[in-house]
């Protein structure tokens, strides 16, 4: 590949690549050595004087410099195309009839008829190739501990050419070929990948085929038209490949294997060849920066089998696991943030901004009741995690939720990392006095600021409480500066120990995640859209051979999950538990245990799960019908800080003095 790129740089520019008109034509001629300048040095003109000869040499040098500049321009100005990922559109190979055992015993080659998988009977170093020179995925060991290594191609890619038309024919690329090539690139690196897949002599069409082999399609119409001009494409299909090597071996009188000649007569213009190289670089970078789905793990049965053998499961959870309890998620179309549009906030996420809270905590406390967790309640999904823990399979539950419901379900503190904190405790932003979170729940439900008893008297000095009559008269109740000192409105306010935007994640997260990702043998992401870093990066930290499963209402397209189970989290958990023969320790399990679920495969590795005879649309309508009041926008009240000049402003932002009993209890708890 490096030699090809070097040869390409030395290749004369085509006439169209330099300029239009006579000037471009002359430049092209000079580059090929057939211009009038060189003709003047023929034997008949040997009497040309030295000065004239020097002038000719100077002109030739100038032309060479101009040519070199033009070469640099085209290399520097050519940009890579936008690439469409099409690996999922490739056909799957049929399972070979000489495999022994059932389909569930093998992995690697997928049957397009049944969706089951089979493993090539060869070892990892067996050279079994296809028309693309790619092999199948080989493994050793049991299903639970197999390590999946991509096969080295039997031989470099070899393009064939029709004898009469002299047009090229590309081998057919299967999904397994593409996945193997992508895995080979990721495991062995760019240099070995190019050395093993490409012949020593190649042209630009080999580069195009490599882009296709990695699962990408070029979008540039001009470039595609140029390729179609030199490629046999009987069906006028943009994807171009027509026959595989097994078909062409029997028609040697029609097709001939071909490698480029040393004279380097590339079928495409240089500008197209340069673009293809840059497109290949872009495709390789995309592959190297993303996870590759496992070819042997894409069915519910694969998930069930792995659950039974896994010992170090990481469960990553989000707000979707609590929606069945009436707690809204955050980022869906019906989620928490979408409902905050009525509040007039520039950015709904401002309610969880540390900077905004410091300036005016009433912004948060006017909506906090909407996300306040129910006490001593948990969903079947929470109990599903507890079940995994009880079977000694749970390495860690990394939860993005702030409701602390996992603890109610019985997940042990050492098995749980609350990545974004929780309502379990609350702390004074001024003196950092800490109490149990449930003690400020009444304040939250009444839209009141909970005030630290130790900072209460000092806060009264800074912020005098105004009566409704004084507020109606327009008197300012804010005293942001006391004796020349700036005092934030959050002075003495108790804040739930949830991680706001602008705050660092708990040290426990950073301490454990580095070790856990190396031990993990199965990752299950549940009820999360994976939009918030650094928690969203966990999927990219897991070793490539570890299966990743998504259980969520909607797909997460920016991640590469091996298996996605789309539906209500409780339903999916019930289906999986049924197939495992396990009981979920939840009061509703007897009902869920006898429920029949339908799993519809919408594409490879993606299933929609819903109760039998109930469509997903019917389930969604039924779910919305029973939404609790706390998800209704009618329960929202504008934050006090947004209507400060209004005479009808709520007085709920005024500090509520704790009772003597409260102070006594608080002092006792310390």
Swiss-Prot record:
It comes from Kluyveromyces lactis (strain ATCC 8585 / CBS 2359 / DSM 70799 / NBRC 1267 / NRRL Y-1140 / WM37) (Yeast). It catalyses: N(6)-acetyl-L-lysyl-[protein] + NAD(+) + H2O = 2''-O-acetyl-ADP-D-ribose + nicotinamide + L-lysyl-[protein]. This is NAD-dependent histone deacetylase SIR2. Residues 69-81 have a biased composition (Basic and acidic residues). Gene3D superfamilies: 1.20.120.1710, SIR2/SIRT2 'Small Domain (3.30.1600.10), TPP-binding domain (3.40.50.1220). Residues 1-157, 235-263, 617-670 are annotated as: Disordered. Binds 1 zinc ion per subunit. Belongs to the sirtuin family. Class I subfamily. It is found in: Nucleus. It comes from the Eukaryota. Keywords: Metal-binding, NAD, Nucleus, Repressor, Transcription, Transcription regulation, Transferase, Zinc. Residues 293-583 form the Deacetylase sirtuin-type domain. Residues 45-68, 82-92 have a biased composition (Acidic residues). GO terms for molecular function: histone H4K16 deacetylase activity, NAD-dependent; metal ion binding; NAD+ binding. Its EC number is 2.3.1.286. The keyword Zinc applies. NAD(+) binds at residues 318-337, 400-403, 527-529, 552-554, 569. NAD-dependent deacetylase, which asts as a key regulator of gene expression believed to help form modified chromatin structures on the genes it regulates. It is involved in telomeric silencing and in hm mating type loci silencing. Residues 120-142, 641-654 have a biased composition (Low complexity). Coiled coil: none annotated. Its cofactor is Zn(2+). Transmembrane segments: none annotated.
